[in-house]
């Protein structure tokens, strides 16, 4: 593998990463091969081994690329959220906009959702993917904490992870069962717990008390 030290080399490297990310979305990990990536990027076959140490390295970069695009979209969504007190339903819908998407009945959105969970499951077997997924998950949790703060709610780190786990479990089960709208069972699960794991801020709570509530184990 040769580092892409020139502008042309960097463009080629990014083209290969983007091509691999497209193939991941369309066909999963089995679709990502040296030849298919080079063909999609319209580059010589040897370029995949020239710019990347291995196919696993290329896949890891593609996963990071896809995750970064999703996180950028989530940041834009969070940036649109005003800071005000929200009820249970409104808060749950905001959380699901980030974790599931606003419209899971759309075929493209459903494909992206499936690809996201495929990447998560694959990281259990591949250390290079695990590191990428953990970095992406940390950023996702920060965005979730932000949107909950903007909804005038308080959440501790371990409770935030519990919230994500409930959504993950509901969505994966719905996808396995062929549910046309995975967001619906995830919403039902969150409605039962959101006020417990991320309760509304108590009126007149002092800043020190609020920070302690967020950090308390």
Where are these regions (language model features)?
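N-terminal positioning helix adjacent to the helix-turn-helix/winged-helix DNA-binding module
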Residues: 12-15, 19, 159
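Short, basic, alpha-helical segments at the C-terminal edge of helix-turn-helix-like DNA-binding modules
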Residues: 64-70
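Hydrophobic alpha-helical connector segments
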Residues: 72-113, 160-163, 187
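Short loop-to-helix capping motifs
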Residues: 122-127
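Hydrophobic/aromatic-rich alpha-helical bundle segments in the mid-to-C-terminal region
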Residues: 129-130, 134, 149-213, 217
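Short, solvent-exposed amphipathic helices
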Residues: 132-139, 143
């Amino acid at each position: 593998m040769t580092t892409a030290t020139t502008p042309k080399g960097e463009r080629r490297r990014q083209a290969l990463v983007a091509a691999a990310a497209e193939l991941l979305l369309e066909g999963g990990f089995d679709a990502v091969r040296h030849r298919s990536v080079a063909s999609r990027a319209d580059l010589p076959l040897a370029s995949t081994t020239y710019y990347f140490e291995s196919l696993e390295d290329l896949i890891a970069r593609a996963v990071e690329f896809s995750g970064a695009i999703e996180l950028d979209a989530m940041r834009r969504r969070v940036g649109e959220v005003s800071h005000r007190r929200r009820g249970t339903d409104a808060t749950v819908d905001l959380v699901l906009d980030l974790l599931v998407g606003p419209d899971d009945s759309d075929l493209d959105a459903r494909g992206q959702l499936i690809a996201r969970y495929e990447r998560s499951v694959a990281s259990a077997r591949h250390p290079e993917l695990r590191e990428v997924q953990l970095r992406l998950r940390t950023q996702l949790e920060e965005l979730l904490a932000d949107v909950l703060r903007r909804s005038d709610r308080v959440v501790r780190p371990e409770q935030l992870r519990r919230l994500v786990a409930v959504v993950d479990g509901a969505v994966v089960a719905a996808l396995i069962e062929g549910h046309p709208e995975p967001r619906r069972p995830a919403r039902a699960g969150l409605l039962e717990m959101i006020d417990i794991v991320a309760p509304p801020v108590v009126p007149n709570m002092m800043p020190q008390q609020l920070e302690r509530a967020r950090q308390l184990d």
